[in-house]
């Protein structure tokens, strides 16, 4: 029997990789629902390839444009909707068994929660769910007895090495260091968005590419790991590994260190999660250690990467600091991508917003959303002070 799958964020890099893996196993999966932001032409192509029952676009204009395109292509039977409620409905559709949660940013929280509350199996690629609302999110996962499998390559690697979690001393999340790891510090002042998005190893969207360049992405992953594996910040370390071959490690109290290795291709963790506890073909080429690059490791430079330090600070501060961190970072990164904020001022906007707001831990989802909105407003105010355009 095939398993019905909904892909939240189908036109993004994780969504496309998921569809690539799923298409290799048509006897196991059927595409029930796809969601996207604004890439109408790409979504129409996906519809022609996979014939979902439902498609949801972020905006009504994009949805209408897609309806016209699908009609012209003879695919009028595909239902097209738009907006946040339609996103949630896609995640909880009766024909959906499993949900790939791959919407980037805070926008992914509500539809992913809808999937959890509907009892779907959830593949979590949206780290903001745990960064913004970790306690509430995991509480819902336990309440609804949902199977939650991590998709981020680092957390998937830890999951594969973690076993039952007994005897774990610490986990080590690896990081490539991004495109600017070896750049002279004075050159960072004139970094452009295109340079920041040119990741040396991974193919990713623009927002997550900038987060990788600042190492905020690794900071968010530290917070995510805290909730996924129930470990304090003191037992989560970050190691720079420029080759992105070792995806993370788990150290045990007896001195053993288990590592998960593989070529840097998101189809590997996706296939692992989709097949768990079995294995399936992913299309990823075999790792050739004999002819590959030498493996290097170094500690992260927190002076060069202040966003990583800010994320650790937010996790240790508790309360809603991580929610504030995430909201301020989204505002700052978007401003950088639009040319309104220099690269080196991203961390300053986040730090100033964290310094101004110290809200208590949220008791309800509405509290999370209110804190997120307030943090965005405060970040915009600080952006006006720091944002002098590209230097």
Swiss-Prot record:
Record GO terms (molecular function): 1-deoxy-D-xylulose-5-phosphate reductoisomerase activity; manganese ion binding; NADPH binding
Pathway(s) this gene product operates in, as recorded in its UniProt entry: Isoprenoid biosynthesis; isopentenyl diphosphate biosynthesis via DXP pathway; isopentenyl diphosphate from 1-deoxy-D-xylulose 5-phosphate: step 1/6
Reaction catalysed by this enzyme: 2-C-methyl-D-erythritol 4-phosphate + NADP(+) = 1-deoxy-D-xylulose 5-phosphate + NADPH + H(+)
UniProtKB keywords: Isoprene biosynthesis, Manganese, Metal-binding, NADP, Oxidoreductase
UniProt: Mn(2+) binding residues: 152, 154, 221
Positions with a binding annotation for 1-deoxy-D-xylulose 5-phosphate: 127, 153-154, 176, 199, 212, 217-218, 221
Enzyme class: oxidoreductase
Coiled coil: none
Record-linked Pfam families: DXP_redisom_C, DXP_reductoisom, DXPR_C
Cofactor(s) needed by this chain: Mg(2+); Mn(2+)
Binding residues for NADPH: 11-14, 126, 128, 205
Gene Ontology terms describing biological process: isopentenyl diphosphate biosynthetic process, methylerythritol 4-phosphate pathway involved in terpenoid biosynthetic process
PANTHER family reported in the protein's UniProt record: 1-DEOXY-D-XYLULOSE 5-PHOSPHATE REDUCTOISOMERASE, 1-DEOXY-D-XYLULOSE 5-PHOSPHATE REDUCTOISOMERASE, CHLOROPLASTIC
HAMAP family, per the entry: DXP_reductoisom
Protein function: Catalyzes the NADPH-dependent rearrangement and reduction of 1-deoxy-D-xylulose-5-phosphate (DXP) to 2-C-methyl-D-erythritol 4-phosphate (MEP).
Protein name: 1-deoxy-D-xylulose 5-phosphate reductoisomerase
Species annotation: Acidithiobacillus ferrooxidans (strain ATCC 53993 / BNL-5-31)
Organismal lineage: Bacteria, Pseudomonadati, Pseudomonadota, Acidithiobacillia, Acidithiobacillales
Gene designation per UniProt: dxr
């Amino acid at each position: 029997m095939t398993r019905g799958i909904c892909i939240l964020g189908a036109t993004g890099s994780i969504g496309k990789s998921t569809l690539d893996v799923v298409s290799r196993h048509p006897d196991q999966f059927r595409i029930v629902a796809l969601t996207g932001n604004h890439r109408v032409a790409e979504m129409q192509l996906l519809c022609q390839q996979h014939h979902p029952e439902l498609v949801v676009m972020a905006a009504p204009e994009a949805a209408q444009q897609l309806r016209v395109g699908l009609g012209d292509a003879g695919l009028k039977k595909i239902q097209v909707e738009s907006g946040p409620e339609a996103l949630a409905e896609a995640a909880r559709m009766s024909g959906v068994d499993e949900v790939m949660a791959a919407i980037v940013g805070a926008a992914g929280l509500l539809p992913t929660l809808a999937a959890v509350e509907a009892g779907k199996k959830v593949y979590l690629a949206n780290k903001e769910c745990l960064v913004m609302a970790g306690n509430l999110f995991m509480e819902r996962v336990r309440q609804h007895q949902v199977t939650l499998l991590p998709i981020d390559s680092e957390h998937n690697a830890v999951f594969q090495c973690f076993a039952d979690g007994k005897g774990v001393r610490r986990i080590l999340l690896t990081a490539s260091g991004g495109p600017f790891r070896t750049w002279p510090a004075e050159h960072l002042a004139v970094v452009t968005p295109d340079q920041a998005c040119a990741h040396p190893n991974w193919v990713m969207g623009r927002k997550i590419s900038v987060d990788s360049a600042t190492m905020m992405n690794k900071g968010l992953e530290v917070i995510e790991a805290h909730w996924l594996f129930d470990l304090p910040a003191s037992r989560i370390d970050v190691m720079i590994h420029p080759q992105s071959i070792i995806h993370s490690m788990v150290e045990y109290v007896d001195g053993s260190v288990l590592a998960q290795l593989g070529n840097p291709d998101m189809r590997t963790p996706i296939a692992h999660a989709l097949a768990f506890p079995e294995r399936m073909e992913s299309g990823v080429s075999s790792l050739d250690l004999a002819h590959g690059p030498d493996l290097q490791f170094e500690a992260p430079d927190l002076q060069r990467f202040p966003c990583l330090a800010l994320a650790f600070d937010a996790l240790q501060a508790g309360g809603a600091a991580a929610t504030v961190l995430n909201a301020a970072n989204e505002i700052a990164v978007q401003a950088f991508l639009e040319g309104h904020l220099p690269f080196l001022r991203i961390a300053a906007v986040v730090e100033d917003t964290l310094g101004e707001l110290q809200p208590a831990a949220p008791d309800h989802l509405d509290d999370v959303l209110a804190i997120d909105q307030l943090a965005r407003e405060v970040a915009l105010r600080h952006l006006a002070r720091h944002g002098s355009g590209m230097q």
